[in-house]
């Protein structure tokens, strides 16, 4: 069975491939990358040199972000971090931009929210953690609104926002996948939003292929493990992935790095046909109606966008759990208890 994807998904895949090598296109775009890098450096310098002051929202902030474009595993990392902080005695809340949603003002996200109004990632975080989640393009405003509504919150986790320097932060965690920094060039010649040398408190690397870690200081492995699939229409109905081995399976993902999801399924012993959808795919209609398969495996991030009108009995959702290194958790807790936002 051949894999299909829309033009946008194919374009995203082409750009991603180009960003992994220093080909003619990358070199042709380096003048634009220099301009991008200068603008980014000036913006960061404005805060590091005191020309602009970051806003202290009154509690420590942990930023989980990346210096590259595309998915690296931030959302499961945020979920695992919220659980770890709660286990350490904190009362965490989460702020996010709400990418993909029409959000202009600080908005609370609950398990009953719609992805179109909250964003798929914040909605998934709210459902998985039960923590207070607020979204707004202005993360400072989101954090202030969260604190006003939930004064019991004593630490805020920012889902992405590494480059949102206006929000004062106590800890910065940068997440990479196996692609690391790609060709090492800044946008648009490469995938980097900032240089790889950018300071951070710790680096997490999610590499399902080799498991190797780069020789960077304070670097920890990030393991993402799939759980038993649950049925979209009957969430209490669960099946181990091994039970799909002898069925005709299509794996579909509208995430930043769909190939990583497909690799996870292959590592579990499946050989699915694959469908890469554009990141934050809206699922305005069912793209699977013509697929002659027994089961369709999708990500949790995609599942939150499928409402009650979806009645495709073939849809199964594969949850992913992030395992954080205990040393990383200890590092974060130590910094939260011993340092004020800066």
Curated annotation (Swiss-Prot):
Transmembrane segments: none annotated. One of its GO terms (cellular component) is plasma membrane. ATP binds at residues 68-75. It holds the Pfam family LpxK. Pathway: Glycolipid biosynthesis; lipid IV(A) biosynthesis; lipid IV(A) from (3R)-3-hydroxytetradecanoyl-[acyl-carrier-protein] and UDP-N-acetyl-alpha-D-glucosamine: step 6/6. One of its GO terms (molecular function) is ATP binding. It catalyses: a lipid A disaccharide + ATP = a lipid IVA + ADP + H(+). It comes from the Bacteria. GO terms for biological process: lipid A biosynthetic process; lipopolysaccharide core region biosynthetic process. NCBIfam families: lpxK (TIGR00682). Belongs to the LpxK family. Transfers the gamma-phosphate of ATP to the 4'-position of a tetraacyldisaccharide 1-phosphate intermediate (termed DS-1-P) to form tetraacyldisaccharide 1,4'-bis-phosphate (lipid IVA). This is Tetraacyldisaccharide 4'-kinase.
């Amino acid at each position: 069975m051949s894999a299909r994807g829309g033009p946008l998904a194919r374009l995203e895949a082409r750009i991603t491939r180009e960003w992994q090598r220093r080909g003619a296109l990358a070199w042709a775009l380096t003048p634009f990358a220099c301009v991008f890098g200068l603008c980014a450096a000036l913006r960061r310098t404005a805060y590091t040199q005191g020309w602009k002051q970051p806003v202290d929202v009154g509690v420590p902030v942990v930023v989980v972000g990346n210096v590259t474009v595309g998915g690296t595993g931030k959302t499961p990392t945020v979920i695992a971090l919220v659980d770890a902080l709660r286990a350490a005695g904190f009362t965490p809340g989460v702020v996010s931009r709400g990418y993909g949603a029409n959000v202009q003002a600080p908005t609370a996200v609950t398990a009953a929210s719609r992805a179109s109004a909250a964003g798929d990632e914040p909605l998934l975080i709210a459902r998985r953690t039960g923590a207070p989640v607020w979204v707004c393009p202005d993360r400072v405003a989101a954090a202030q609104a969260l604190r006003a509504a939930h004064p019991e919150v004593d630490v805020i986790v920012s889902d992405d926002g590494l480059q949102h320097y206006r929000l004062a932060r106590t800890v910065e965690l940068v997440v990479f996948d196996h692609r690391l920094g790609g060709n090492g060039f800044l946008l648009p010649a490469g995938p980097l939003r900032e240089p790889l040398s950018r300071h951070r408190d710790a680096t997490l690397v999610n590499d399902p292929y080799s498991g190797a870690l780069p020789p960077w200081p304070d670097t920890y492995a990030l393991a993402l493990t799939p759980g038993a699939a649950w049925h979209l229409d009957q969430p209490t109905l669960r099946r181990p992935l091994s039970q799909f081995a002898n069925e005709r399976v299509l794996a579909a993902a509208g995430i930043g790095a769909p190939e990583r999801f497909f690799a996870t399924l292959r590592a579990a012993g499946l050989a699915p046909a694959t469908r890469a959808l554009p990141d934050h795919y809206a699922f305005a209609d069912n793209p699977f109606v013509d697929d002659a398969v027994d089961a369709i495996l999708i990500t949790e991030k995609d599942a939150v966008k499928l409402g009650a009108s979806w009645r495709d009995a073939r849809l199964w959702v594969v949850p992913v759990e992030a395992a954080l290194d205990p040393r990383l958790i200890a590092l974060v807790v130590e910094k939260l208890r011993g340092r004020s936002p800066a």
